[in-house]
A protein has these predicted regions:
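Active-site or ligand-binding cleft "flap/edge" segments
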Residues: 1-19, 64-73, 110-111, 116
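Aspartyl protease active-site motif detector
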Residues: 4-46, 75, 93-95
């Protein structure tokens, strides 16, 4: 499992982000969701996260910039993700599905992201 902490930009705002291959989905907190397009979910979604169960009725389209590269992905809005190992609040939890979609690979030993597989264009077959 790989985890990297890094700032990404959302609508010009710097957001403390945890890239975590152990999390399937992507989550944002309400202060980030305020600058995103949000919609109500058709039903309440429950997620086991950070030792507890979180519920949401809101989804968002996350448009962000990671190391100068644009990404767009689906995210769930939850009140609080939690704090990192240093006690800093996590604003975005970037999950494995979005990392796979955008060719992002955490390199924990070097505390960086590998974006060599970032797609400049999508080729569908």
């Amino acid at each position: 499992m790989g985890r990297i902490r890094q700032i990404i930009k959302v609508d010009g705002q710097e957001c403390w982000t945890l890239f975590d291959t152990g999390a399937r989905n992507t989550y944002v907190i309400p202060s980030v969701a305020r600058v995103l397009k949000t919609l109500p979910t058709p039903r309440t979604i429950r997620t086991a996260l950070g030792g507890g169960v979180k519920e949401t009725n809101t989804e968002a389209v996350l448009h962000a910039e990671i190391e100068g590269r644009p990404i767009s992905t689906y995210a769930l809005v939850i009140e609080q993700i939690g704090n990192d190992e240093n006690g800093k609040p996590i604003e975005i939890l970037f999950g494995a599905l979005a990392m796979q979609q955008w060719g992002i690979r955490p390199v924990p030993d070097e505390e960086r992201l590998d974006l060599t597989n970032y797609p400049e264009e999508f080729v569908e077959f």
